[in-house]
Amino acid sequence: MLAHLAFQTLVLVVDGSVVGRGCVALMLHVVYKGRALPVAWLVRSGKQGHCPADLHLALVEQVHDLLPAGARVVLLGDGEFDGTRLQAAIQGYHWSDVVRTGRHGTVTWDGEHFRCETIGACIKPGTLVALREAHVTRDAYGPVLLLCCWAKDYHEPLYLLTHMADADEACRLYAKRLRIETFFSDQKSRGFHLHRSHVSDPVRLSRLLIAAC
């Protein structure tokens, strides 16, 4: 399937969710015809929360090895996936990415140092601000394109990091990240209720996901 879809840009979405009893599944999906289709996952013991960066890297590497050489890829992720190690790995694969980052994130741009929320405090709903050649975190990782997107009818702006050149395209693609939330709802409250399974072994849960997906 991936080889067939790779004739066009592959939009991948990564996220984690509680499964079974005391386990979390980190999953990577491909967006196809409005749905998020699971491609690969890793299950670990642990409570709901951010997975270790090493697990992020392992999953992305696993999917990279499945793709045909030269595939055009955009990876989407929420604030869990704004780590610089993951961004560097994605760059090494020659993929594009659009990931959310927190409002308290440190930014260096045009010789100035400030937090992401400083941008949001200066704009109104319906505004998109793009800071090119920005560096983020205290380690000044970059350059990246930092976006502050405040959609109309929303209470606060969204802060995104990307290596894409087109700010509007990056925002449009990031909206597809929500497709993975629909998948998790289908597997939980509207479907297999994986979060209520009493299975606590990561290996068994990984196999169960094969059947559920």
Where do the language-model regions lie?
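Single, function-defining residue in the core of a domain
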Residues: L5-L10, R21-C23, Y32-C213
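Aromatic- and Gly/Pro-rich donor/ligand-binding loops
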Residues: V13
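Nucleic-acid-interacting cores, centered on viral/eukaryotic replication and modification enzymes
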Residues: H29
